[in-house]
Amino acid sequence: MKTIPLEAFLTVSMILFGLGLIGIIARRNLVTVLMSLELALNAVNIALVGADHYLGLAEGQIFALFIIALAATEAAVGLGIIIAIFRLKKVESTDEIRELRG
């Protein structure tokens, strides 16, 4: 049975993390920023599972499950906050939220 090399896991993980980071920095829509954050968290999961596969330990999978639970909680709370902001102020972008201060 062929095994996937650790470099493949880490390369895919770095690419996905970079795309997520670019989405967080470049996008202004709140939902898109939240989705980019989820992409970055999933990239970390891929790196952890790849390291677990390479080292033969279970800690990577345990941490990945913890991050999945954390990401689900973060998505639920984040979407709730985004919906509340939109209902109160009719704001969709991060620039408009900065203007609401004061």
From Swiss-Prot:
Family recorded in the similarity comment: Belongs to the complex I subunit 4L family.
GO annotation terms (biological process): ATP synthesis coupled electron transport
GO CC terms, sorted: NADH dehydrogenase complex; plasma membrane
Complex formation: NDH-1 is composed of 14 different subunits. Subunits NuoA, H, J, K, L, M, N constitute the membrane sector of the complex.
InterPro entries hit by this protein: NADH_UbQ_OxRdtase_chain4L/K, NUOK/Mnh_C1-like
Membrane topology: Multi-pass membrane protein
Protein name: NADH-quinone oxidoreductase subunit K 2
PANTHER family in UniProt: NADH-UBIQUINONE OXIDOREDUCTASE CHAIN 4L (PTHR11434:SF16), NADH-UBIQUINONE OXIDOREDUCTASE SUBUNIT ND4L (PTHR11434)
Record-listed E.C. numbers: 7.1.1.-
GO molecular function: NADH:ubiquinone reductase (non-electrogenic) activity; quinone binding
Transmembrane segments: 6-26, 30-50, 66-86
Pfam families noted in UniProt: Oxidored_q2
Enzyme class: translocase
UniProt-annotated location(s): Cell inner membrane
Keywords per UniProt: Cell inner membrane, Cell membrane, Membrane, NAD, Quinone, Translocase, Transmembrane, Transmembrane helix, Transport, Ubiquinone
Catalytic activity: a quinone + NADH + 5 H(+)(in) = a quinol + NAD(+) + 4 H(+)(out)
Function in brief: NDH-1 shuttles electrons from NADH, via FMN and iron-sulfur (Fe-S) centers, to quinones in the respiratory chain. The immediate electron acceptor for the enzyme in this species is believed to be ubiquinone. Couples the redox reaction to proton translocation (for every two electrons transferred, four hydrogen ions are translocated across the cytoplasmic membrane), and thus conserves the redox energy in a proton gradient.
